[in-house]
Structures are given as structure tokens and as C-alpha cells.
Amino acid sequence: MILTTTHEIEGRRIERYLGIVFGEAIVGANVLRDLLAQIRDIVGGRSGAYEAELRRARETALAEMAEAARRLGADAVVGVDLDYEVLGSGNSMLMVTASGTAVKLAP
């Protein structure tokens, strides 16, 4: 499955647009609290544990979006966009959303 932020794929022709697809991942309160507790891991102003958790959430959102596209019979998702939003009381959760347009490529 090709995922790209561009609206076309170099060297390939889009045969059909299949629709908008999404994937979401939410990092809950306990995870954020644990990550903040590990602030001692910060080296050079960066927290390896926090970045790893964000990476996992991003990968989950992208994988869910790709699976939604696969169910539509897509070969690729173009115009991929990632959004991050803080949710919950006390901003205790982080939601990562991936969205894009599922497409069928010409053979």
C-alpha cells in the first residue's frame, strides 16, 4: 500500500478515487502521566520515551487508515494528512488522526 502526502504518484496514473479514509489512535492518561514521570530520560531537551509513544500512535493511525483503504480495494492513499489533538479533562489524552484519499491505480 502506497501512502503519500502528495496528490499524485510519480509514474502512476490514478484510475479511480474510492473515497476518504481515516485512522485514529489515542494515547491515554496513564501513558501520558508515565511519560511525564520519565522526564529524566530527556537528553538534549528531547524525551525518548515520549517520542517513542508518539511514533507508535502515528504508526497505528497510519496502519488503520491503510487497512480502511485496503477494504475499499485501493492500491494507494494520496493526500495523507496527520493531525494531533489534546483531549480530555486536564488535557490527559492525545489523539493522532491520519486521513487521505483511497485510490485505485491504473495497471
From Swiss-Prot:
> One Pfam family for this entry, by name?
YbjQ_1
The superkingdom of the source organism is Bacteria
What does the sequence similarity comment in the record state about its family? Belongs to the UPF0145 family.
> Which NCBIfam families does this UniProt record tie to the protein?
PRK02877.1
The protein's name in its UniProt record: UPF0145 protein TTHA1256
Q: What is the lineage of its organism?
A: Bacteria, Thermotogati, Deinococcota, Deinococci, Thermales
